[in-house]
UniProtKB/Swiss-Prot annotation:
Its EC number is 6.3.5.-. One of its GO terms (biological process) is glutaminyl-tRNAGln biosynthesis via transamidation. HAMAP family: GatB. PANTHER family: GLUTAMYL-TRNA GLN AMIDOTRANSFERASE SUBUNIT B MITOCHONDRIAL AND PROKARYOTIC PET112-RELATED, GLUTAMYL-TRNA(GLN) AMIDOTRANSFERASE SUBUNIT B, MITOCHONDRIAL. It is an enzyme of class 6 (ligase). This is Aspartyl/glutamyl-tRNA(Asn/Gln) amidotransferase subunit B. Disulfide bonds: none annotated. It catalyses: L-glutamyl-tRNA(Gln) + L-glutamine + ATP + H2O = L-glutaminyl-tRNA(Gln) + L-glutamate + ADP + phosphate + H(+); L-aspartyl-tRNA(Asn) + L-glutamine + ATP + H2O = L-asparaginyl-tRNA(Asn) + L-glutamate + ADP + phosphate + 2 H(+). It comes from Chelativorans sp. (strain BNC1). The keyword Nuclease does not apply. Keywords: ATP-binding, Ligase, Nucleotide-binding, Protein biosynthesis.
Amino acid sequence: MTIIDTRTPDPKRLIPGATGDWEVIIGMEIHAQVTSRAKLFSGASTEFGAEPNANVSLVDAAMPGMLPVINEECVKQAIRTGLGLKAQINHRSVFDRKNYFYPDLPQGYQISQYKQPIVGEGIVIVSVGPAKDGSFEEIQVGIERLHLEQDAGKSLHDQHPTMSYVDLNRSGVALMEIVSKPDMRSADEAKAFLTKLRSILRYLGTCDGNMDEGSMRADVNVSVRRPGEPFGTRCEIKNVNSIRFVGQAIESEARRQIAILEDGGAIDQETRLFDPGKGETRSMRSKEEAHDYRYFPDPDLVPLVFDQAYVDALAAELPELPDEKKARFMASFGLSEYDASVLVAERATAAYFEKVAAGRDGKAAANWVINDLLGALNRTGKDIEDTPVSPDHLGTIIDLIKDGTISGKIAKDLFEIVWNEGGDPVRIVEERGLKQVTDTGAIEKAVDEVIAANPDKVEQAKAKPTLAGWFVGQVMKATGGKANPQAVNALVNQKLGIE
């Protein structure tokens, strides 16, 4: 395959070395476990966390005479993913045997797709950033192909002092291998690409993207070169299982290769592993070429053939994807690109926001969801599906601010009460006396008391009007945050003689 370099070297992406600047070239192969209740060629369950060898059929164990039968749901999921990646869907694809030996690969080969994959070239638009001014830079990362293949089993080395055991629960589970083109030029771009791809898969419902459970893993190909020169020799970093580790692995491997080249050495094409504890990669084995696997069509499986009507029916059922939803949020709710990007990153977050924003000010809803709700979720380690503050409750809090029932400060306290204790926001406001003080007489009394207690500050404020804000803060503090801020501000300015 001829690799075409489509990007001009970007000075801000270059890595400074002892002998000049270097450019890192990154491509990825992502193994995404297909969301399906059964495996690719058997009816065994794909449940995560089952007892070892509980979900194994005779096909998965490669018992003599057992033949594979394709799971149509896995085919549909691959097509849906291809459509989500704006990729070419191949109406005819072929399953091949990829021959190699692993102790946890009972067949002695993996059923995969080589020359004729189910999905061809596609594209992912990736937003990198934000920059200091809040802007994003968009890059295009090409998708070379997507093919279906079986996962291998798992070797267990910690069960016995002298023996290793094999768990075949994962054997035969359907994977989509999504191969990107080498279009990324920094660790940040690679992390943004992987984040975007995972978001697309989750929106489509074709992979849960849970990297900590192994249902999405990345093989990262890294090489370095002088700007404008041909691609260098690449090394593959296998099975990186978090987006943060992907970034660390790329940075470590790029530094390693630059150091070797600057010392006059040469890069060996090899497969490496990333050690998160040490923050570095280490050699695993020499990198195989395609001919090492002796691919040939699987004689037990006929070619996979479907027509355009089959594809069109699946396309008609696709959900709104992140890019389309982001554009709609910006247009319909007047959100900034940053806020819209945060809200659409996860499908559940976007759905929550839409419920809160329905019939309300979109910007206010976005601020509460991003700053307060997501902040609380991050602080407590909860998922949005488990939030104690429902969209209806958050919407009610926003309504109470808008109609003047509570102040913005009290609203923050009310959110924490609902988060920690639950309950209806309206009832909590009534029972705890949290309503905003709008009585001008009561507010004026509080203003007079603060001014009387701080005569030195009064003279300073008259000379420097911005200090009026200090008086406003003291009045709000004295009233427990219940005073109407606009009324307080107006009275403070009036009493201090500030226009």
